[in-house]
Structure formats: structure tokens, C-alpha cells
């Protein structure tokens, strides 16, 4: 779902070839969690469900994607494959990695929160026009409900004030 201004990509990520959604769940290989850069960030793991990038870079990367998928036993998940490519580029380019994550939810907001569970991300404040992340102090323009158990129907209810909350927290509505 798109909210806000889609031109943010150029403003925040013009020096990168590809930007992935950052999330709180290190999936599918939890052993890689300690290898990710920016350990101080909450949204530090790659989520392949949302990405934006330059067409030339993406087209150049597709053969690498195909190479990784040749071993299905090892690489059965597109998120795992993109994670491997991310780490390949990180090893090769270091801080100049052309692939990055949206660590501060400037564009993408993943609704999954590993700390609280599926669709229960308490960093987010919803209103009819925007979502606001209190932790990162950003207004992401795209939100993503990953996996089969994370539902945007709950988000729709909140945004449209159809979620019957009997004990409304001031904190929940402070940004509305």
C-alpha cells in the first residue's frame, strides 16, 4: 500500500542501486543476524517483499539471482537469496555497498514486529492519510504485511477508525 510521496527514493537513496525494506525478523537464516550491519537499528534485517532501485542495477543483478536459485536445497526462499546477494555485495564493497536497507523506515514500513508478533507493530501510529513510526520519527510511504499471517485488514480498520478499541491510548492517537 502506498501512502505519502513516492519521490522519497531519490531524496534518501539516490546513491544506491537497490533498497530493501528493513524488518525486525532475520529470516530465513537466523544465524546471519549478528553479521548484519547497523546492529543498533531495530529494522536491520532484509525483507525482500519490498524493494526499489535503479532499473540498470536490478537488470545487472538478475543473473546473480538466477545463480543462487540453482541450489534449491540451500536457497528455497527469495528472501534468503536476496540476503545472500546483499552479503556478497557487502563483502565486495564494504561501506560502498550498492545494496542497502531502509533501516529507518523512510520509505518502507514492515508491519511485522518480531518483538510483538505478526501485525502488532507498536512503533506505528496510524491516521487516515499517513503512518508514522515513533521510533524512527519517519512517515513511510509504503507499508508491507509480510507472510500469510500478517494481515493488512487490521491496518485498514485502524486507518478507517473501524477498529473498536474501548481503551484508546493517548499515545496511539497522538499523531492523528
Q: Which residue stretches match the model-derived regions?
A:
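GT-A fold catalytic core of metal-dependent nucleotide-sugar glycosyltransferases
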Residues: 1-28, 49-52
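Hydrophobic transmembrane signal anchors and adjacent membrane-proximal interface regions, especially
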Residues: 11, 122-124, 133, 163-165, ...
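Short, flexible, basic/aromatic active-site loop/helix in glycosyltransferases
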Residues: 30-41
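Juxtamembrane luminal stem/stalk of type II transmembrane Golgi/ER carbohydrate-processing enzymes
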Residues: 151-176
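Structural alpha-beta junctions
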Residues: 13-19, 88-100, 165-170
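Short C-terminal domain-edge/linker segments immediately following a structured domain
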Residues: 23-26, 54, 82-84, 173-176
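Catalytic core and acceptor-binding pocket of nucleotide-sugar-dependent glycosyltransferases
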Residues: 43-157
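Short acidic/His/Gly/Ser-rich catalytic and metal-binding motifs that mark active-site loops
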Residues: 28-31, 62
Amino acid at each position: 500500500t502506498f501512502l505519502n510521496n513516492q519521490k522519497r527514493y531519490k531524496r534518501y537513496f539516490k546513491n544506491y542501486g537497490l533498497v530493501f525494506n528493513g524488518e525486525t525478523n532475520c529470516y530465513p537464516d537466523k544465524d546471519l543476524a549478528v553479521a548484519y550491519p547497523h546492529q543498533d537499528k531495530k529494522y536491520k534485517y532484509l525483507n525482500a517483499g519490498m524493494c526499489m532501485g535503479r532499473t540498470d542495477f536490478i537488470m545487472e543483478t538478475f543473473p546473480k539471482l538466477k545463480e543462487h536459485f540453482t541450489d534449491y536445497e540451500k536457497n528455497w526462499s527469495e528472501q534468503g537469496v536476496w540476503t545472500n546477494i546483499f552479503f556478497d555485495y557487502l563483502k565486495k564493497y564494504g561501506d560502498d555497498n550498492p545494496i542497502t536497507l531502509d533501516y529507518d523506515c523512510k520509505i518502507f514500513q514492515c508491519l511485522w514486529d518480531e518483538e510483538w508478533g505478526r501485525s502488532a507493530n507498536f512503533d506505528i501510529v496510524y491516521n487516515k492519510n499517513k503512518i508514522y513510526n515513533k521510533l524512527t520519527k519517519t512517515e513511510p510511504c509504503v507499508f508491507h504485511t509480510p507472510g500469510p499471517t500478517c494481515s493488512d485488514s487490521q491496518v485498514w480498520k485502524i486507518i478507517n477508525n473501524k477498529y473498536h478499541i474501548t481503551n484508546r491510548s493517548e499515545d496511539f492517537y497522538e499523531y492523528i
